[in-house]
Amino acid sequence: MDCSFPEGDPAAVCGKRQQFGSRFLSDPARVFHHNAWDNVEWSEEQAAEAERKVQENSTQRVCQEKQADYEINANKYWNNFYKIHENGFFKDRHWLFTEFPELAPSQNHLKNLLSENKRSEVYEYYRSGEDGPDLTIEEQHRCSSVSLGDKTQPPLTEESVTQKLHHLEICANEFPGSSATYRILEVGCGVGNTVFPILQTNNDPSLFVYCCDFSSTAVELVQTNSAYDPSRCFAFVHDLCDEDKSYPMPENSLDVIILIFVLSAIVPDKMQNAINRLSRLLKPGGIMLLRDYGRYDMAQLRFKKGQCLSENFYVRGDGTRVYFFTQDELDTLFTTAGLEKVQNLVDRRLQVNRGKQLTMYRVWIQCKYRKPLGSSTG
């Protein structure tokens, strides 16, 4: 159905969902009047040009020796990233409560959480940040991992964290957050730009948040943050791809699992096993939330020859990696893990640099998949 909307109208018509925003570009002459436009459809010419650019930048692949290095030393590249940027790279993701109201279960009318001023901040947020050293992009996250201990302790090495987790007894009645009635796990938490807004928004003492990251440096930054409260949050180092590493909570114990620009950072052939394991952690009725890069996003089109690892999988200049998904690929990953689709949508956004008169087309995919009631395995 062909729908056009005046700028600023609600996106209730034609089945458009409001969470992705309601600023629509009906007059191309006004493109530089705002920093971003929502639900922007591509022309056939744009789609063909995007496909051509991807074919072009995929012709020259990274050699196998370097590919092995990026995989074996993936934690080193992410640790270097956080040592350089610390907690100054990403902004706190307050927009998540509009997209994923499941993250604030005690609040009502979450769709109205953002005022117009807050929504302006969201648009500005999407324009900021670096996707590695080469691109101006919103998000950048990795294969998940982090560390144990409280903020009064000296920084923990990854080895000591792993050892503590190995000796932690995980049973039905005794584990971190066992007394909570609502449990959230963020995989790939970085320096806490999702975790801390969740804790600040939810004052319910029965809510507990786990967060993990592949980078011990990132987890250390979470644990030493003044907002980190070990009575409400448990941060730990974890490699999402390592099937021998256990989680600090039992199966069927989590209400929500969050994957924000994380799954795209791991090797494609390891994604399914990672989702399978996470699915087993969900309670029956629990939900997995994902937001990640979509096929032909601006970031993919800007990669140069020699940065392609495999089809739609690239390495950035800093050694971190990124994959660009289709909706069908993500649907297959989640349904194969035994989850049921609640939402699988493409967010097409036109970002504008008014100073340089540049337009940048972003493509993100947002998913919600639920574990069926009555299911006790992933």
UniProtKB/Swiss-Prot annotation:
Query: What function does the entry list?
Result: S-adenosyl-L-methionine-dependent methyltransferase that mediates N(3)-methylcytidine modification of residue 32 of the tRNA anticodon loop of tRNA(Thr)(UGU) and tRNA(Arg)(CCU). N(3)-methylcytidine methylation by METTL2 requires the N6-threonylcarbamoylation of tRNA (t6A37) by the EKC/KEOPS complex as prerequisite.
Localization in the cell: Cytoplasm
> Which residues does the annotation say bind S-adenosyl-L-methionine?
W78, Y82, G188, D213, D239, L240, I260
Recorded hits in InterPro entries, A to Z, give: Methyltransf_12 (IPR013217), METTL2/6/8-like (IPR026113), SAM-dependent_MTases_sf (IPR029063)
Major localization class: cytoplasm
Q: Which Pfam families match?
A: Methyltransf_12
Tell me what this protein is called. Answer: tRNA N(3)-cytidine methyltransferase METTL2
- UniProt similarity note: Belongs to the methyltransferase superfamily. METL family.
Please write the reaction equations for the catalytic activity of this protein: cytidine(32) in tRNA(Thr) + S-adenosyl-L-methionine = N(3)-methylcytidine(32) in tRNA(Thr) + S-adenosyl-L-homocysteine + H(+); cytidine(32) in tRNA(Arg)(CCU) + S-adenosyl-L-methionine = N(3)-methylcytidine(32) in tRNA(Arg)(CCU) + S-adenosyl-L-homocysteine + H(+)
An example Gene Ontology molecular-function term: tRNA (cytidine-3-)-methyltransferase activity
